[in-house]
């Protein structure tokens, strides 16, 4: 059964900790939640004393939302059935999570959202990226080889991807039928290209935070940040990682870390630090320093977490699966999937990316 209290706690943690937006900042804000569903995010805003309007086209979802705020005695939230593009006005904080990739034209939807944000206001969105969802897109294509009707899709998806469905149920706090509908049956999964997202938002929208966080080589002095005004794709390395992802981050780090290598690295820095007496260093520190350097050279650890090697294996398995889509029957495809080491394992990519942008007039 759906545990509202647990889900609110998880979602509040995403906003406050993962996305660095303290919940106390919601106090007094006028907020609009587009495609609010059953109202979880809107309730979080309302519990933190914001004035909230939640809209969704689904009357059943709105009915559930209204029941929840009645039970919680929240008078500062109003839920209304409305079409996405009919919602007007400007707000301090606009949100729409796990929704716009289901629109026929997601970028048109994003453009509509950005127009609803006041200057100095915030836009909170989550959606599927095309790169993060390469594996999900392949799943959907494969399932449709064996039938287009809903019941056929339910049956085939459970045959081909049972572990993926179970994982989504467990971590997504959803029913199996809802997971299968959203992942496989729903005809509209128009995932977004992140560069197009940033272009649509324009220079007035500054990235406040994202989850997962992006990772790029960053080691310039604060006085000489060469990347500050440099135009390049800051998300490329992250998107490569998200696309092939098949394990939890903790597992990947545990499998590629070396306590000996870490110790040797820090020992090297300690041995070289503050050595003002040359003779003392040469007599007592030089040989040990030399040995540590050899250890660092010869240790087989891959400090990039084997990402390049892993990605090459990942795309090789995609090539094998493409042949399976073309030639195999259901049983053959199911058996082929079981032989993969990277593809369709564990997390199978990344379903949703979260972003908070702030609007700044320039």
Predicted regions and their residues:
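Conserved SAM-binding loop of SAM-dependent methyltransferases across substrates and taxa
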Residues: 38-49
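A short glycine-rich, Lys/Arg-flanked "PGG" loop and its adjoining helix->strand segment in the class I
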Residues: 107-119
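Conserved class I S-adenosyl-L-methionine
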Residues: 122-158
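Rossmann-like AdoMet/SAM-dependent catalytic core
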Residues: 174-356
